[in-house]
Structure formats: structure tokens, C-alpha cells
Amino acid sequence: MERITVTLGERSYPITIAAGLFNEPASFLPLKSGEQVMLVTNETLAPLYLDKVRGVLEQAGVIVDSVILPDGEKYKSLTVLDTVFTALLQKPHGRDTTLVALGGGVIGDLTGFAAASYQRGVRFIQVPTTLLSQVDSSVGGKTAVNHPLGKNMIGAFYQPASVVVDLDCLQTLPARELASGLAEVIKYGIILDGEFFTWLEENLDALLRLDGPAMAYCIRRCCELKAEVVAADERETGLRALLNLGHTFGHAIEAEMGYGNWLHGEAVAAGMVMAARTSERLEQFSSADTQRIIALLERAGLPVNGPREMSAEAYLPHMLRDKKVLAGEMRLVLPLALGKSEVRGGVPHDVVLSAIADCQQA
């Protein structure tokens, strides 16, 4: 069992990583006997895990209600969020309740925002079931729903009480979702840890076949890197923005193509190549390192080009609504070397458009 602490003073919390955690009531600390829980999951995961998690919580004396939401990025919306509020009010649940997010990034983000908002804030626990959510979205307290004009535009910084990563969940993960999660894994190597990037080049095949020790190390290292960044910059005023490598481009793809048509990791993968190409044009990143990124993404089964039906010019309106924009100026996360990156403003639009055009599908 691996345990990592996200250090935020009184709001610090553990990330527990192991196989078989759904069999152990102690995995869901700080829940105690007699407390009330609302389990939030989706219709795909409910048949796989809902009864198991409900059973282990009830074994510990926890009072469990549940709400099952539709599955997909397009349901990460205010309308579906209201479904959670209605379920909480109908039971009813008070300020002493705990929300448990049992699912991937959509469930985690939406449940976290529900917890931040319901009766001005209640406790919640992240139980991520996808690789992407285990290495990224469940850690750090970013919660949100989407708006038709932009991804994650309505949300709050709100930290969980704990994160429970059961490695067994990856056994039921579709191959496309596994690849999507690997995009965020590769991101950490590009922006923060060149040695980890090299490790990924050497061990990607083991990750693709869900080798236990390799996957446990991979998730632990990603969570360590994320925890260090969040502890240093919880509200993304500086260092934490680096975690958005590829996201400014990727969010444009997701919004333009319709949420869910491109998985988040797929869009981020193409976006990371666009960021590398932009950095190349500014003469601060080598084409050889761009090729290493492309090769690793392709081995993971990820796209390295944007959608062919989306012109380079179609990206800009979305990118100019990005949350990193300051005083109307687009700011991009750009790699400087493998393991080193920066947030840069003032990149000429023609440079960005040229990089995007270079990454369009033929």
C-alpha cells in the first residue's frame, strides 16, 4: 500500500494507493459508524462497483444513499449537478453528510462541486476509477462543471477529505480510457520530471498490459508530483498552471467537437504536441524532444494531430476564453526541455496558428 499526503495545513489529506481497497472499510477514512453518505456514480460504473462500495461502507456502520448519473463528458453540466442537489435534499442530507465520488473525472469534478456548493460546503471523498482521475483530476481540489462556451468554467477549489485509489478498477477500464489517462501521465514527465519521461519510454508496454508493480509506481509518482505542486500553489497563481500543458489547445478541441467526442486525454495529447511545436517555433524546445513526445503518445494509442474538420482559426476563440488568460492575453504552458516548462504570455497568434496547422490531420 502506498500513502501520499497532500500537505495543506489543516486541510491536508491522504491519497491511498493499492489493489483491493474496496474490500477494506478502513480505506474510506475519515468516515465513521453512524455517519451519512451520498454515493455519486454513473450508470456504467454502478453495476461494477456500487454494491461493493455500499456493502463495505455499511459493514462499517455508515448510512449510504446513492444517486446514479448518466455517463459521459456532456453530462458534466449544471442540469445534472441539480440532480445531485435534488437527491441530497429529498433524503434529506444535512451539513454533516459526506459525498463520495465513485467514478472518473466527470463524476469527481461534478461531485466535488456539489460538495463545495451544497449548504455552503460538505465533506467529500474521491474514489477515482479511471487512470486519468487516479493520476490527476482526483488530486488537488479542482471541481467544476462545463458550460457550452467553455470547459470547467463553473467551479471551485475545494479539497477532498481523502483520495482512495483502488488499482483493481483499472481491470475494467476500456483501452481507449486507459490511453486517455496515459496522456496525463506523460504530461508529468514533460513538464516536471525528465527521468520519469524516460522511465515511461522504457515501461510503457508494461503499463499497457496493466502490470501491477509498474502501474503502482506510475500512479504513485504522478500523485507525488501533483501533491508537491498543489502544496506549493493550491489556487493556481503560478506553478500549478504548468499542469495545464496541452489543455489550452485540448479544451478548444473538446468544446468545438462537442464534449465527449474526443476524450479529455486524447485532446490533451494533441494539445501537448501543439504546445511543443509552438515552443519549437520560439526556438526554446528541440525538434528531437518533440519527436520523443510524439513517439511515446503514438505508442500509447493517442492522437498527435487535431481533428481534420477543425481549422486552426477555430481554436483561437476557445483559447482566448481559457482561464489562464490575463488582460485579454493568451498564456500558454510550453515545454523548454523534457522535465522543464514555463507559462508564457504574448506568443504571437500567427506562431500559435502555424503550430496548430502543423498538427492538423491530413
UniProtKB/Swiss-Prot annotation:
Pathway: Metabolic intermediate biosynthesis; chorismate biosynthesis; chorismate from D-erythrose 4-phosphate and phosphoenolpyruvate: step 2/7
Function noted in UniProt: Catalyzes the conversion of 3-deoxy-D-arabino-heptulosonate 7-phosphate (DAHP) to dehydroquinate (DHQ).
E.C. numbers: 4.2.3.4
A single MF term (Gene Ontology): 3-dehydroquinate synthase activity
HAMAP family per record: DHQ_synthase (MF_00110)
Cofactor note: Binds 1 divalent metal cation per subunit. Can use either Co(2+) or Zn(2+).
Name of the protein in question: 3-dehydroquinate synthase
Disulfide bond sites: none
Binding site for Zn(2+): E184, H247, H264
UniProt entry keywords in alphabetical sequence: Amino-acid biosynthesis, Aromatic amino acid biosynthesis, Cobalt, Cytoplasm, Lyase, Metal-binding, NAD, Nucleotide-binding, Zinc
Known cofactor(s): Co(2+); Zn(2+); NAD(+)
Keyword set includes Nucleotide-binding: yes
Recorded family membership: Belongs to the sugar phosphate cyclases superfamily. Dehydroquinate synthase family.
GO biological process, one term: amino acid biosynthetic process
Subcellular location: Cytoplasm
Any Pfam family hit: DHQS_C
SUPFAM superfamilies in the record: Dehydroquinate synthase-like
GO annotations of cellular component type: cytoplasm
Species per Swiss-Prot/TrEMBL record: Escherichia fergusonii (strain ATCC 35469 / DSM 13698 / CCUG 18766 / IAM 14443 / JCM 21226 / LMG 7866 / NBRC 102419 / NCTC 12128 / CDC 0568-73)
Residue sites binding NAD(+) per the record: 71-76, 105-109, 129-130, 142, 151, 169-172
Major localization class: cytoplasm
Catalytic function, reaction form: 7-phospho-2-dehydro-3-deoxy-D-arabino-heptonate = 3-dehydroquinate + phosphate
